[in-house]
Each structure stands twice: as C-alpha cells, then as structure tokens.
C-alpha cells in the first residue's frame, strides 16, 4: 500500500522525506452515509517531529473537508527515542492539545532522562512544579501512544533534596500557602540550598523564551506590593524592567528581615534577582520565585552635558500637548537641571496648560528659568481658490468669459527645488467647451526611479522621446499665455512650474492659478475627501484609478470637473473673480490643514497677550481644530514669533514650494528655527533622502543669515530617554478624540516607518546633528549662542498670582455681617450667648479681613433664590463647620455643641456632657420659661476644619442644588457677573490606564511586536497622564473681578472643544488658580428634587420632620418599622434600601455590623463609608474585635481634633495631626510620643496611621440630614416615598416584572443576584446590573402591601409615577419602557391632552412611535382599552 500513501501525500500536498517513503496506509474505511473515515498509518522509521506534525495537520485539514468524523491510528515499527525530539513532541502536545500551560518554557531539556525502552523521566524541582506537571504527564502518555510510540511512558519524579532542605519553612506557615512556600528560602539572602544552584544570567528578553529554570536577571523596579495573608505570611512582589522587556518576581516569607530588605527597595531602584522560574496556577504567567535580591547601580549610563557653553532647548513639548508629549513638567525640569541647562522653552500645541506646574517647580529658583510659549496652529484667511493673492485689477474678471488651461503635471518628487518635471497634460476651455488639448513628456537629467514608474506608469523610454526642459517650459508658457491656470491642489503644480520657470529664466509674471481642490471645499464642504478621484465620483465624472496619475488623463478628468464647478458657481450667482476670491465659511476653514509656528512671551505683559491668543485660537478660531488666521496675529514688543519646527509653514515651503516663497516666509519671523535633521527621518523612505533634507536646511540657514535673522537649532523633544521612543510611537499611531491623527502618523502601512528620535539632546549631541554644515563656528552659533541670546531677552515670568482676587459685589462685607447678626438675634435673642458671640466674631474677623465675605454673600443669595423657588439646598464639604455659613442661610448644619433653643422666647441651654456630639440626639424637652417644646441643634464641628488654623485658607463652598434647578442657578450667576467674567471651572482629561492599555495593544499588533504582559504593564504605567481633551467641573463656576480680564489669570476654551456650548471654561485646570479667583461649586443632586416632590405629595414640610424619632433611627438596622420582616425582603437586615448614601450594599453591610443607634452614629457611618482605609481593616476591626462603639472610633476628620482636645492635647497640635492624618500622611515619632503622654490609646494611634483620606464631618452631617428626612417619608408615607424614588432616583426598570406578583419578582431578583458574580457569558449585562437595585425596592414595596399597576394609556404621565390610594398602588409613567425616552413619552402625553386616543392606529399616527415600540405596547397590554383601527368610529 506504499503507492496509496504516495498518492495520498500528493493529495494533501505533503513532501515525503526520503526516510518515510516506505510508509504504508492500511485498512482504509469510508462510510459515506455516516460521513466517517478511518485508516492506519504504518511508519517504518520513527518520524522526526517536524515531519510528523506537518503530515498530521495536513491530513486532518484534508479529512475535515471530506467527512464529519475521522479516526487515524499511527504505528511505528522501529521506534527510536531522541531526547530533543521527544521534547518537541511534548511541547507541541502541551501547546496544541493540552492548552493549559506553556510547557516549553516551564522545564529545561536537562530535566528529561530518556531510556531506550521508552521510559522517560521528568524531574520537578519543587512541589509546586510537580503539581503543575502531574495532569499533563498522564495526558501526554496517552497522546504519544496514539502517535505510534507504543511503549512510551513519561514518569514524574521529585527532587527530594530540595524539599528536605526547605522543610523548616514549610512547617512554619499556614497550610493554605504551603504549596507555594515549600520551595522558598529562609530569606532573600543565599540559603544552603541556594549555594548548590547555578543561576544563569539572562536579559529579560531572553528570560521569556529560556528553558533554564534557575536564573539571574537585572532590572529597574517599577512596581512593588506587599500582601499579608490571613496567616500573617507576607507575599513580597516586585515588577522590574530593563526597558526591553519586563518580568515579575515574588517571595513568600514571615521573616522580619525580609520585610526590611523589601522596604529598602524603592521604585526606580535597580536590582539583581536570582531565583527559580515558575508559573502562576491560574493564569500560567511566568514569574521568578525570589531566592536572592540585592540593589545594584543602574547599568544604564546617565547622559551628561559636558560642554562648557551649553545649549537651550527652545521647543519642548509636555504631556499637555494633546496625544503627543509624554513628559510631565517635573520630568522635563529635572532633566534640564541634570544637563545644567539654564532654561528651557515649553511650547505645547495650542495649549499652555502645563504652565502652572512649571511655575510651581521653578518660579523661586534663581538659577533656572522657564520660557513660556506655545506652538500655534495657523491658516490663511484667504480661501486660496486663487493660489496667489488676487490683484485688484483682476477683481472684475467674469468667470465665464475667461479662457482656462486645465492642466496636470507629473514629477519625480514633491520638491520644486529638488525634483524634476517629466510630463505635462492640459485642456484649454472657452465658453464651457474644450478648444485645445496638449500632452508631452519632458526629459529629466536623472534616471526615473521605480516608485515613480509604479505610481504613474511612465517609463524611461517615454521620457527619452520627450522635450528638453527648456523647450518644454517655453511650450507650457505659450499655452498659459493670457489664460487662467487651473489645477487640482494647484499650489503644488503652480509652484513647481514657477520654480522651474525661474530656474530657466522664463517669465512667470501674473500667472493666475485656480485650485479646484479648494473650490470643491467651498462648494461642497461635506465631502470627506477631496482627492481628484473622490471629487470626480461625487460629481459623476468618470475616473479610472488604473489609468490615473498620468498628466494627460488627470487633466482630462479635471476639465470635466471644472466645467461642472463653473456651472455650480453660476447657479449660486457667483460671476466675478472677486466674488470667488471672497467665498468662505466655517465649514471651509474646518477643511483647511493648519501649520505650526512658535510664540514666546518675553515678559509679564507678553504672558497676558499669549493667553489672549490661546483663548482666541480655542474659541473664536476653532474650526474643527484650533486654527488662527495668520492675518489676525498682531506683532507685539512683548512677544517673539518663531518659524516653528517640523510641521511649520516655513519647513513646508522649504520642502514643497519655491525659493521665493521661502524667502517671503522668512520675513514673517523674529527668529528662524532649524529642526534637527534626524527629525525628518520619517521622510527618508517616502519623500526625501537624508542628504536632500540636509541640502535644503543648508539653503534655509544661508537665506536666513542673508536676512540677518537669528537662527536657532531645535530638537523638538518629546522625551528624555531613548527607551521612551516606543511610548511616543504608541501615541503617533493612536487616534485622539473624534479620530484625530498625529502629524507624524503614516497611513500607508506597506511602507517602513522610521519615526524620528525626538529625545532631549545634550549640546554635543545637537552639534553632531548639525555636523553636516562643516562649519564649527556656525554650528556653535545656531546650537549654543543664538538660543542663549533668545533666552536673554526673556524675563522671569509669574504665571500664577500669589493672592486671592475676589469680585467686589453688592457691599458684601457690610451686608454679610448684618445678615449674620440679624439671623443670630432672630434665633438666639438680642443678647447673644457668649459662646455664640465669640464664635461669630472668631469667624467673621478673618472672613472680612481676607475678603472671603463675597464668597459667603454670593452663596447666600443663590441659596435663598433656590429656597424661594421651592428647592432645598444641601451643603457639601466643610462649609457646615462655619456658624457664619449657618446664620447666612448657606447650610443647615449647625457646628455648635449640642444645645437647646426656644424659638419663642430664645431661651438657650448649652448641654453639659451630652450623650453624643449631635444635638439631634437630645431628648425632647420643654422650655423652662414659656413651656414650649425646645428646638435642639448643634453637631460639634470646629471652625478650623473649614478655613484652617489661621482661617486664611481660601474657602470652598460646595452646594447641592436640585439637578433640575442647577442650570437656572448657573445662569443666575452669569446674570449677576456677566458672561465675560463667569466661566465654568476647567478640567483636563488625560489618558487613563485602561485607555493607554488599549493604545499599546493596538500598536503592538499593528507593528507586529510581541512583548510580555509585564512589559505591557510597564508601558501602560508610563503612557498614562497625556492630555486627550478638556472638560469642566460638574458645578464649578469661576468669577473674575470686573477690573480684570480672564486672561489676567488663565486663557479660556470650550469644554471638550464643544463650540455649541453656552459656557466657556478656564483653560487651566481650576485647581491651578484655586487660590487666585473665586470658585462657586453649584452642583446638581437628586436629594433636593426628591424632597420637593415628597413635600408636594405629602403636604409635610421637611422643616417639620422630627429630629429624633425611634422608628426612623430603627430602619437603619431593621425593617420592622416598615411593618415587614427580613425574611419578607430576601433576608435584607435593614430598612435602608433606597435611603440616599445608606442604600448601597457596602453601607448596608456597615449598618448591620455597626448597629447605629443615634443620629451621631449615622454621621459616623457616613464618614466611615466615604473615607479611605477608615473602615476596612481599621474601624471595622476595632468595633468587631476590640468592642469599641461608633462614637469611639475615628470616622470623620473633625473627630480627631475634637477627641485630642478633650484629652488635653494642645489645640494647634490637634489641628496639625488632624490635617496630616486626613491626607494620609500619618504621624511622626515625636507626635506619637506626645499623644502617648496625653493618654491617647495605642489602638487610636494605630488607627490614625492607617488612614489615607477622611471625610469632613460637616459634609457627612449634611448627607445624613437629607437621608433622615427621606427615611421619615419612607416610614410614614410609603406610597409617596416609592413614587418619588421611582420618579427621581433611577432610570432603569423592568416594568413587566415589577408589575407582576411578588413571587415572580423575587424569582427574577434571585436569578439576577446569582448571576451578579459570574464571570462568563451568563454574567449580568450593564442594564441588568443597574436594574437590580430597582427590583429590590419594588420587592420591598410589595412586601409592605403595595402594588405596581401596568402603564395606563389614559392616566400615565411622561416621567412621574402616580399614586392610586384606592388600590394602594402606583401607576408607572411611559418613560419606563425601554427605548421610549423622555421626549417621546412627553409627546404621548401632549397628544393625549389634545385629544383622547381613539385607536392604536390613531395613537401611531399622532405620536410617530416606531413599530418595535408598538409591539412592546401590545405585548404589555397597554392598548387593551382601545380598538386596533378607527373604523368603528366611522360607522
């Protein structure tokens, strides 16, 4: 059957090796009916792995196309076991069949021992490795036997010596980590067993593919982590990189000395790690089990600038250049100082957002100066339909009366100064008809390259038959004479011919050129592309790409296009050249490509002018992108204008236009920037050679010197180190907002791309870049002397002001004090209690002295407006710690100690030793003077937490207005101060980790680069923080005093470049100018909206809600006050579902464990739940394990100051400690010593040291006050509560389930709850996750005896739920239906109000509802009350 094997191999295209030609196929069987095939393959000799694999895969692929089922039986007559071949077979089985771990990188070939009888031993060097291999060995044995290795037996053995040597460690740790820790050493230092191992030194790239098990690697630490297990064993993890690759290393240990070693290793330290390569159990990712680790010196030599006279970089980009620069201001300044450079110029792209950080880093540094500038995008105001400015004498030329030469040229390249003309084609048009055609080739001086031939189809033979250049130009000149030139992208053709005419002494005067490309942009601004073929397609002109790029063909196509364009102009009433010349629109400008110039501020006045230019280009001149008109840039003695870098108009003209254009362009600038030749490397494979670039740069320097311009060499750096180039390339290849592309991005992926290395260069490195000039004196001049000359003209500039500038408004300093005392007298009596008088004066004095009164006064006016319109206002932040804020009506939180006050006779009683720090927890009590019930108030909050210990901190007054009222308040602020002085607080959106990861993965795939996950993690970490776009604070409004312009502080822009926005935002992130200008935080919140609805539905004013109520406090720990048990609501232990700030799973769990009993306890819960490391592993442990209560633990930042003062700690130290702890800075040893002296317990001190962030008590109190009120309505007005909840607090419903019985609803909840934690295809969708809380609330409502009806076509509202008291149920609105939306819901209600719906047909006609929603309405039974059609009404 050898012949059948040969035939079969031909069929499957398998080349049979000589030694396998005796192979036979036996017992073939084919069952066509069952689509089954089987056979036996008998190998005489043992097949080599690669041959077997190829045969096996090709056989399988072939049979898969013929039958559904197949069975192959392999036999090998002469079996020979060779270790290297067996290793390959095992690797393949693991990768292709077992698919559970990377076997080939898991063990070394030395771990295999092969016996001739087929027994093969695999040695595992740890219990961990043994467990990993076990399942695979069993699988591999069966697979190898099926391949014909009949007696194959792979046996696993364990290196017992290693296990014995490590046994002491194994017995000392918790059982759950025994497996991993069994092979660990006693410390990071060498153990006895370690000394017996030979660790192979590898690079991190080699590590990825090595077959070695014990390795030694070197890298820089970029991530470290310590995990403490339940058994107190610690897992030390580090990630290291050598900038080519990365890996992770870890160690299990319980030893203190290991902790010390690990603590000594910091991020950016270089280390040498020795250990064993292992795989993670779940992910099977490689890591090194650390046996030894030690810090070493960095093997990478620091670059130094050793020149005596040093250069200055005048064109640096930072992270604030959108999707371009990758360095922070700190990175840039540190490197500049390392080089001992005296200054750098920061020129971000249409942005000055990095200025504040540069200012803060360097303003007080006398030896270093930042030059503040900007790379500005510019375009011409001219529409450039006429390539050169149209002279007045041609203005009245009639379009249809002229003769036109519609032409195209082909060239050897893109540069009129460097390349040659090889073909000309033209059609002459008169009165809309072609009267002449011309076509000829021109002989070039150099041989035609293959690229040009491939693009155009023109060969060297074509050109040999052409005209000499001089003759050709004279012929072209005669064709153009007294006619108008027309070309597509005419600037290229026009300038190319113009340069050739001038070079050959042929007159080129008053040649008028029309560009059909720009004409198309004006006439058809909606086209996505304006290439000749695209425009032809849009105008239905025939265009064949296979013939295109020939002058004769392209000119004939363009002729037909231009005839149609003239017709369109006539239809639009455009008849004269001057009318054509003046055509423009914002859409047209949005299609224009901008070029970049440099602008530098020379002094403080120049900074403001720069800010104004920045504002203008981001607002007034924003045409799809920032593009300022060249013509509108005013020259100033306070600014320097540079020619720009790689993407500048000057470089564009140098490479793609005429010498005359270049000379005219040079005249526009104060100094000429010459980019480093290496920055043009991306041109080398597509447009220009390195030599051509250098020739042109030499010309530019020569011409600029002839015009006595200051010439400076620039590097345009984006990064400091060579390895960072890959990060810049990632951004070059990533799309920004609205799919914007980087200027260096090359669309043609079939070309090799050599992106420039835009590293920050030393003086010597830059001199080397310009060595092609062969003139040391000239090189010194442009690299060192002239940049320093520019720097010497620049003053040290202050970017951020050093004090607060508040608006003068409404005599606020007088009116605020008056209002505060009037309200104090009204509440506490004319003779104010001493404690209140002192507190008012303590606050008012600094508020008035520092000019903070206007902030209070404006806030008070806005709150009163909201209240007068029926909307409550909640306070945020620490404003509630100010009694002045309370008395001016800004906040409801009273910061005084717990006290009683009589609203009738002003009896005042400060409670001694109150049960809690909240006055709301005081028992009800009658006035001893007039027998009226006393009001109770006071939350014990020190004023220092708001304005600082010296009361000089700029106040943040954050207010929660109703979400539906927020816009009106914003407009009110604008009305009060004017649109030129009110701006939304700007933010900067940068690339987050998840987005950076996506960029990197896409780039690596595109570039066919393969890096480990660890190196991707490293790149991700280093790629974050780059600017993507701008944004705005959700409620922050900046107010600029009338006597200033906004540019005295910051430029402005539209948020996220939305030119339709009614507000502009500060260009600087608002934090940068926080201490300079007034910021109001006017936020939108659900609570005021919900409470207004509850007041309306119940008639109960929130002011009348009791401050102490047993039922209300009880629902935070039990549902009993709601009339239900926990069992009735799926085991929920509290009644807090749906209560703002307390209804989340996390907080409800806190409630069930901490069991709050008072209002003060609720404030503590609010503080704990909003802090970081305040509850988890901190207060939670203290309450559960140490038996402390909520009032004893630290929950809010203010607690620390209050508690410490009570213990006798000095007030200033108490304040300092509070500030440190709330910011996560812990305590100093001296502070701990003093606290112990004052009797502060250890658990309290340890608790403070764990805290990373703390919530202000005033904010927590304001939240709890709102929650308390909502809880009141939930307890006493259930239907009103649920109607409000569904109307205001959720947008996600499953109304079909919600309107069914409780059993069905509970079943759905259980299903979703089960799937909530799944991580497979059955996990919850985003909508289901968001709907689940709504279903829990609906279930609770049903448990209380209430129901939800179906949507009622005659009654339901658009958005609000209706209460049906008679049936104890709610009627849902239309907007709960998926896909319907508020607009359509309102349209249904409006149509119904006009006239009752007669039928489904009538409903559809009047609402415009789509068929999908109609079917949804029908399936839900909403149309049951009306007939299908109108016919019944016509009878």
Curated annotation (Swiss-Prot):
InterPro entries the UniProt entry points to: DNA_pol3_alpha_NTPase_dom, DNA_pol3_finger, DnaE2/DnaE/PolC, DNAPol_HHH, DnaQ, Exonuclease_RNaseT/DNA_pol3, NA-bd_OB-fold, PHP_dom
Q: Where in the cell is it found?
A: Cytoplasm
UniProt keyword list: Cytoplasm, DNA replication, DNA-directed DNA polymerase, Exonuclease, Hydrolase, Nuclease, Nucleotidyltransferase, Transferase
**Could you give a GO molecular-function term held by this entry?**
DNA binding
Single GO biological process annotation from the record:
DNA-templated DNA replication
Q: Which reaction does it catalyse?
A: DNA(n) + a 2'-deoxyribonucleoside 5'-triphosphate = DNA(n+1) + diphosphate
- Enzyme Commission identifier(s): 2.7.7.7
PANTHER family of this UniProt entry?
DNA POLYMERASE III POLC-TYPE (PTHR32294:SF5), DNA POLYMERASE III SUBUNIT ALPHA (PTHR32294)
NCBIfam families assigned to the protein according to its UniProt record, in alphabetical order = dnaq, polC_Gram_pos, PRK00448.1
Q: What does this protein do?
A: Required for replicative DNA synthesis. This DNA polymerase also exhibits 3' to 5' exonuclease activity.
Q: What family does the entry list?
A: Belongs to the DNA polymerase type-C family. PolC subfamily.
The molecule here is called DNA polymerase III PolC-type
List the top taxonomic levels of the source.
Bacteria, Bacillati, Mycoplasmatota, Mycoplasmoidales, Metamycoplasmataceae
């Amino acid at each position: 059957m050898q012949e059948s094997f040969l035939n079969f191999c031909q069929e499957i295209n398998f080349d049979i090796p000589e030694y396998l030609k005796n192979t036979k196929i036996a017992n073939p069987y084919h069952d066509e009916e069952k689509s089954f095939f089987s056979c036996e393959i008998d190998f005489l000799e043992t097949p080599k792995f690669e041959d077997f694999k190829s045969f096996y895969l090709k056989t399988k692929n072939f049979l898969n196309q013929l039958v559904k089922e197949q069975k192959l039986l392999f036999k090998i007559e002469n079996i020979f076991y060779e270790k290297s071949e067996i290793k390959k077979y095992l690797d393949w089985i693991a990768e292709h069949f077992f698919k559970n771990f990377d076997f080939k990188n898991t063990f070394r070939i030395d771990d295999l021992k092969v016996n001739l009888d087929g027994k093969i031993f695999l040695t595992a060097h740890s219990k961990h490795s043994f467990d990993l291999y076990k399942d695979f060995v069993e699988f591999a044995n069966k697979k190898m036997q099926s391949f014909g290795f009949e007696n194959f037996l792979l046996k696993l053995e364990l290196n017992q010596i290693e296990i014995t040597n490590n046994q002491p460690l194994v017995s000392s740790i918790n059982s759950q980590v025994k497996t991993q820790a069994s092979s660990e050493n006693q410390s990071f230092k060498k153990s006895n067993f370690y000394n017996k191992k030979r660790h192979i030194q590898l690079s991190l790239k080699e590590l990825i593919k090595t077959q070695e098990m014990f390795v030694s690697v070197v890298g820089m630490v970029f991530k470290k982590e310590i995990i403490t297990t339940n058994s107190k064993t610690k897992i030390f993890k580090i990630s290291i990189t050598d900038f080519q690759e990365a890996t992770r290393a870890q160690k299990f240990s319980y030893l203190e000395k290991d902790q010390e070693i690990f603590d000594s290793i910091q991020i950016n330290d270089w280390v040498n790690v020795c250990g064993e390569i292992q795989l993670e159990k779940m992910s099977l990712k490689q890591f090194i089990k650390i046996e030894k680790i030690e810090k070493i010196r960095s093997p990478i030599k620091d670059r130094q600038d050793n020149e005596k006279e040093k250069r200055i970089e005048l064109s640096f980009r930072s992270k604030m250049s959108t999707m371009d620069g990758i360095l922070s201001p700190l990175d840039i300044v540190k490197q500049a100082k390392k080089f001992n450079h005296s200054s750098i110029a920061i020129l971000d792209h249409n942005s000055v957002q990095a200025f504040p950080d540069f200012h803060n880093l360097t303003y007080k540094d006398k030896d270093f100066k930042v030059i503040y500038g900007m790379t500005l995008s510019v375009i011409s105001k001219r529409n450039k339909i006429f390539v050169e400015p149209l002279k007045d004498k041609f203005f009245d030329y009639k379009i249809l009366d002229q003769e036109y030469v519609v032409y195209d040229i082909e060239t050897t390249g893109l540069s009129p100064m460097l390349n040659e003309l090889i073909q000309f084609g033209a059609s002459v048009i008169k009165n809309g008809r072609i009267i002449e055609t011309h076509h000829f080739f021109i002989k070039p001086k150099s041989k035609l390259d293959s690229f040009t031939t491939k693009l155009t189809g023109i060969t060297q033979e074509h050109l040999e038959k052409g005209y000499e250049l001089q003759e050709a130009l004279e012929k072209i000149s005669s064709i153009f004479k007294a006619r108008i030139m027309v070309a597509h992208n005419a600037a290229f053709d026009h300038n190319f011919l113009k340069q050739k005419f001038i070079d050959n002494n042929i007159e080129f005067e008053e040649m008028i050129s029309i560009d059909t490309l720009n004409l198309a942009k004006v006439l058809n601004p909606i086209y996505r592309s304006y290439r000749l073929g695209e425009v032809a397609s849009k105008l239905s002109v025939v265009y064949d790409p296979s013939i295109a790029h020939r002058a004769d063909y392209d000119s004939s196509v363009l002729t037909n296009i231009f005839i149609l364009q003239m017709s369109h102009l006539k239809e639009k009433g455009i008849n004269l050249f001057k009318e054509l010349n003046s055509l423009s629109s914002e859409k047209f400008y949005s299609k224009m490509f901008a070029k970049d110039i440099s602008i530098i501020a020379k002094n403080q006045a120049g900074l403001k002018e720069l800010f104004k230019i920045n504002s203008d280009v981001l607002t007034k001149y924003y045409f799809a992108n920032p593009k300022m008109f060249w013509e509108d840039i005013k020259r100033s003695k306070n600014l320097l204008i540079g020619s720009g870098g790689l993407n500048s108009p000057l470089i564009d003209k140098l490479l793609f236009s005429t010498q005359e254009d270049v000379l005219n362009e040079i005249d526009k600038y104060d100094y000429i920037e010459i980019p480093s030749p290496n920055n043009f490397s991306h041109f080398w494979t597509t447009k220009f050679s390195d030599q051509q670039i250098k020739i042109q740069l030499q010309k530019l320097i020569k011409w600029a010197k002839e015009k006595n311009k200051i010439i400076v060499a620039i590097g345009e750096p984006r990064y400091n180190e060579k390895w960072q180039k890959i990060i810049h390339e990632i951004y070059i290849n990533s799309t920004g907002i609205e799919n914007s592309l980087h200027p260096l991005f090359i669309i043609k992926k079939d070309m090799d791309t050599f992106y420039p290395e835009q590293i920050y260069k030393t003086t010597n490195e830059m001199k080397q870049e310009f060595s092609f000039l062969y003139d040391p004196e000239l090189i010194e001049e442009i690299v060192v002397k002239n940049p320093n000359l520019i720097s010497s003209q620049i003053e040290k500039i202050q970017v951020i002001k050093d004090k607060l500038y508040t608006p003068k408004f409404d005599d606020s300093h007088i009116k605020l004090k008056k209002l505060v005392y009037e309200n104090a007298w009204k509440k506490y009596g004319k003779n104010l209690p001493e404690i209140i008088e002192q507190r008012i004066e303590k606050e008012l004095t600094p508020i008035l002295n520092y000019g903070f009164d206007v902030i209070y006064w404006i806030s008070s006016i806005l709150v009163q407006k909201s209240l007068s319109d029926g909307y409550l206002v909640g306070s945020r932040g620490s404003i509630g710690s100010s009694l002045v804020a309370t008395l001016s009506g800004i906040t409801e939180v009273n910061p005084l100690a717990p006290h009683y006050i009589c609203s009738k006779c002003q009896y005042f009683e400060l409670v001694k030793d109150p049960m809690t720090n909240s006055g709301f927890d005081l028992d009800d009590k009658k006035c001893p003077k007039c027998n009226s019930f006393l009001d109770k108030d006071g939350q014990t909050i020190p004023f220092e937490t708001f304005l600082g210990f010296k009361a000089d901190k700029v106040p943040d007054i954050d207010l929660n207005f109703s979400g539906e009222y927020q816009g009106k308040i914003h407009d009110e602020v604008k009305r009060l101060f004017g649109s030129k002085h009110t701006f939304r607080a700007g933010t900067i959106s940068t690339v987050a980790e998840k987005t950076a990861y996506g960029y990197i993965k896409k780039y690596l795939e595109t570039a066919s680069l393969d890096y480990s996950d660890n190196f991707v993690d490293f790149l991700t970490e280093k790629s974050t923080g780059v600017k993507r776009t701008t944004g705005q604070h959700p409620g922050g409004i900046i107010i600029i005093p009338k006597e200033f312009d906004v540019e005295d502080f910051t430029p402005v822009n539209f948020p996220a470049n939305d030119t339709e926005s009614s507000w502009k935002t500060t260009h600087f992130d608002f934090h940068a100018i926080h201490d300079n200008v007034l910021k109001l935080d006017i936020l939108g919140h659900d609570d005021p909206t919900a409470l207004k609805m509850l007041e309306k539905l119940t008639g109960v004013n929130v002011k009348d809600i009791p401050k102490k109520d047993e039922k209300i406090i009880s629902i935070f720990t039990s549902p009993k006050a709601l009339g239900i048990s926990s069992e009735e609501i799926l085991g929920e232990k509290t009644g807090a579902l749906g209560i703002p700030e307390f209804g989340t799973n996390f907080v409800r769990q806190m409630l069930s464990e901490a069991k709050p009993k008072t209002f003060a306890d609720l404030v503590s819960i609010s503080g704990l739940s909003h802090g970081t490391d305040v509850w988890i592993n901190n207060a939670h442990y203290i309450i559960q394990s140490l038996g402390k209560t909520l009032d004893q633990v630290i929950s809010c930042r203010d607690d620390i100051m209050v508690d410490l003062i009570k213990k006798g700690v000095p007030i200033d130290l108490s304040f300092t400690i509070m500030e440190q702890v709330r910011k996560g800075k812990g305590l100093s040893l001296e502070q701990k010593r003093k606290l112990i002296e004052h009797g502060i317990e250890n658990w309290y001190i340890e608790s403070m040291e764990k805290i990373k962030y703390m919530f202000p008590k005033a904010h927590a109190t304001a939240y709890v006050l709102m929650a308390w009120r909502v809880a009141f309505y939930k307890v006493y007005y259930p239907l009103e509560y649920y109607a409000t909840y569904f109307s205001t607090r959720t947008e996600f419903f499953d109304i079909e389930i919600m309107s069914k019985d409780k059993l069905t609803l509970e079943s759905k909840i259980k299903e979703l709850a089960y799937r909530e934690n799944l991580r497979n295809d059955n996990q919850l969708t985003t909508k289901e996750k968001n709907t689940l809380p709504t279903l829990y609330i609906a279930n609770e409502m049903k448990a209380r005896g209430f129901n939800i009806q179906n949507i009622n076509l005659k009654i339901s509202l658009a958005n609000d739920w209706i209460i049906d008291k008679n049936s104890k149920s709610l009627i849902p609105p239309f907007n709960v239906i998926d896909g319907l939306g508020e607009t359509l819901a309102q349209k249904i209600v409006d149509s119904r109000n006009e006239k009752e719906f007669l039928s489904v047909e009538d409903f559809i006609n009047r609402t415009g509802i789509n068929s999908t929603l109609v079917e949804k309405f029908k399936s839900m039974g909403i149309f049951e009350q009306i007939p299908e059609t109108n016919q019944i009404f016509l009878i």
